[in-house]
């Protein structure tokens, strides 16, 4: 529906991103509540929802709010009710959609899985979302050679590919690489995906490198070796790192390991978040020769 109120557009974005209902932002201001439950809003929602386990929880929450404020004068939209009934038995898990301006990126992931088969790459982490926002606000150039380390679900790589860059997405886990390939196909993106073990496999020539949440205790020295190799191959390469400061000591230990390179913290922009996530403080660093 065209001309929808801004808060309904945000509801749609959160629904497609499958934001947890306990932190779902239904309205932007108190005066939006009556609009959220009128006939227009119900038709708007009926056009975006599809039967799934997430939709079941989403509509259950919506109907609960509706029952709490409605005195029974408004009829429930039949299409919404039908979708809810279908969702009761649905086991379908749709891809998550991350919307960054004109770029809609579909990602198949396990949003509530922290670790699967020894890897954290089964879901998109907050630092990865923040890095995607950073790239959207500081676009890569068409034709630029982009390397992503620890690609995870591939959100950052796919965004860069949609911007016209030549992308190599890498990860140290074979199954994670398979997941990136699947997500690239889902978005009709031509992305080269390769398994890369830090400190072991030689990296390829790149104009710019992106990595999010890659500073772990056991991998710090190997990561530092790979970053040094990248700069050696192309001294003009820039490396952009994002990290959630869950353990600041670990990140600062990493910075000590790359003292042979130039690392500077990037200033946090004042723009509001585009995607929906909660996170510890996230820092950005640019590493260069």
Curated annotation (Swiss-Prot):
Disulfide bonds: none annotated. It holds the Pfam family Methyltransf_16. It is found in: Cytoplasm. S-adenosyl-L-methionine binds at residues 125, 150-152, 171, 198, 212. GO terms for cellular component: cytoplasm. SUPFAM superfamilies: S-adenosyl-L-methionine-dependent methyltransferases (SSF53335). Coiled coil: none annotated. Keywords: Cytoplasm, Methyltransferase, S-adenosyl-L-methionine, Transferase. GO terms for molecular function: protein-lysine N-methyltransferase activity. It is an enzyme of class 2 (transferase). InterPro entries: Methyltransf_16 (IPR019410), SAM-dependent_MTases_sf (IPR029063). Gene3D superfamilies: Vaccinia Virus protein VP39. It comes from the Eukaryota. One of its GO terms (biological process) is cytoplasmic translational elongation. Its main location: cytoplasm. Its EC number is 2.1.1.-. S-adenosyl-L-methionine-dependent protein-lysine N-methyltransferase that methylates elongation factor 2. Belongs to the class I-like SAM-binding methyltransferase superfamily. EEF2KMT family. This is Protein-lysine N-methyltransferase efm3. It comes from Schizosaccharomyces pombe (strain 972 / ATCC 24843) (Fission yeast).
């Amino acid at each position: 529906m065209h001309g929808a109120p801004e808060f309904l557009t945000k509801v749609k974005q959160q629904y497609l991103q499958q934001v947890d209902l306990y932190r779902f932002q239904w309205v932007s201001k108190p005066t939006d509540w009556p609009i959220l439950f009128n006939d227009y809003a119900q038709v708007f929602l009926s056009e975006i929802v599809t039967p799934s386990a997430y939709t079941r929880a989403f509509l259950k929450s919506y109907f609960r709010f509706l029952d709490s404020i409605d005195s029974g004068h408004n009829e429930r939209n039949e299409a919404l009710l039908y979708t809810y009934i279908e969702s009761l038995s649905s086991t379908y898990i749709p891809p998550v959609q991350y919307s960054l301006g004109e770029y809609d990126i579909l990602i198949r992931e396990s949003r509530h899985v922290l670790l699967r088969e020894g890897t954290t790459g089964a879901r998109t982490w907050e630092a990865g979302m923040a890095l995607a926002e950073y790239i959207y606000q500081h676009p890569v150039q068409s034709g630029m050679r982009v390397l992503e380390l620890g690609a995870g679900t591939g959100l950052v790589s796919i965004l860069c590919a949609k911007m016209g860059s030549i992308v190599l997405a890498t990860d140290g886990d074979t199954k994670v690489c398979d997941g990136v390939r699947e997500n690239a196909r889902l978005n009709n993106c031509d992305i080269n995906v390769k398994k890369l073990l830090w400190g072991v496999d030689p990296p390829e020539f790149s104009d710019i490198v992106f990595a999010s949440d890659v500073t772990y205790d056991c991998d710090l020295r190997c990561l530092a070796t790979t970053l040094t190799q990248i700069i050696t191959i192309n001294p003009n390469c820039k490396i952009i790192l994002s990290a959630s400061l869950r353990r600041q000591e670990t990140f600062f230990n990493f910075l000590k390991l790359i003292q042979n390179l130039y690392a500077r913290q990037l200033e946090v922009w004042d723009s509001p978040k585009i995607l929906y996530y909660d996170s510890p403080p996230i820092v950005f660093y640019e590493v260069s020769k």
